[in-house]
Amino acid sequence: MPRNDSFQRRAFPGGASSLQERPARSVAEMKKQQASKIREIGTALIASGFHALDAQADVLELSRTTTWTIIKSKHKSSGLSVGTLNRMLSARRLPPIVRAKIHEYIRQKAAGLYGDSEKRIRKIAALQSRTSQG
């Protein structure tokens, strides 16, 4: 399958297509930045008045286990899945500040800032185009 060069230029400035070709930022630094951004989602929930895990899970429309994983930054190193992000964004009572943090995370992940593969970036970019804030 041919490489989509316009995607490459947007996702990886300079046309880098793999972790080996990307700038000197280490994978560990990228994952640390990703974990920090995910923690901001939890902080936004607390700032919106959702202190208890049950309340947080309810407003995100996720299971308690998934919510705990997000809040405590115990997620796998690949970050939040497109499915989880979709469920959170479709939550009817999601506070605007939390929604904004999720969109920030999606934008940064789609830009390749967290060291994801091209395939994962394409998936997140598709989610971004479907759910972009106006």
Model-derived regions, located:
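A short, Lys/Arg-rich alpha-helix, primarily the initiator
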Residues: 18-49
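Glycine- and charge-rich intrinsically disordered segments
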Residues: 1-25, 126, 132-134
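Helix-turn-helix DNA-binding elements, focusing on the entry/boundary residues of the two helices
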Residues: 52-53
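Helix-turn-helix/homeodomain-like alpha-helical modules used for DNA recognition
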Residues: 97-134
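Recognition helix of helix-turn-helix/homeodomain-like DNA-binding domains
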Residues: 61-79
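N-terminal acidic-hydrophobic amphipathic loop/helix motif that frequently occurs adjacent to catalytic
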Residues: 13-14, 18-30, 98-109
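Short alpha-helical "recognition helix" segments of helix-turn-helix
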Residues: 56-57
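DNA major-groove recognition helix of helix-turn-helix/homeodomain DNA-binding modules
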Residues: 79-104
